[in-house]
């Protein structure tokens, strides 16, 4: 059990969880508001 908690508190697992969470937020935002992420610069 101690090894499992050490693995779950390691940096790569936290980075992957954060990236997955951020990607999910971006995907859902893009699903509801598809035009807001791609503003023309003109």
Swiss-Prot record:
Cellular component terms (Gene Ontology): photosystem I; plasma membrane-derived thylakoid membrane
InterPro entries (UniProt xref): PSI_PsaJ, PSI_PsaJ_sf
Gene3D superfamilies reported in the protein's UniProt record: Single helix bin
Membrane-spanning intervals of the chain: 7-27
Annotated compartments: Cellular thylakoid membrane
Biological process per Gene Ontology, one example term: photosynthesis
Organism of this sequence: Microcystis aeruginosa (strain NIES-843 / IAM M-2473)
SUPFAM superfamilies associated with the record: Subunit IX of photosystem I reaction centre, PsaJ
Topology versus the membrane: Single-pass membrane protein
Identification of the protein by name: Photosystem I reaction center subunit IX
């Amino acid at each position: 059990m101690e090894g499992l908690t050490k693995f779950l508190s390691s940096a790569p697992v936290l980075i992957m969880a954060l990236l997955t969470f951020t990607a999910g937020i971006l995907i859902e935002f893009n699903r509801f508001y598809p035009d807001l992420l791609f503003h023309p610069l003109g």
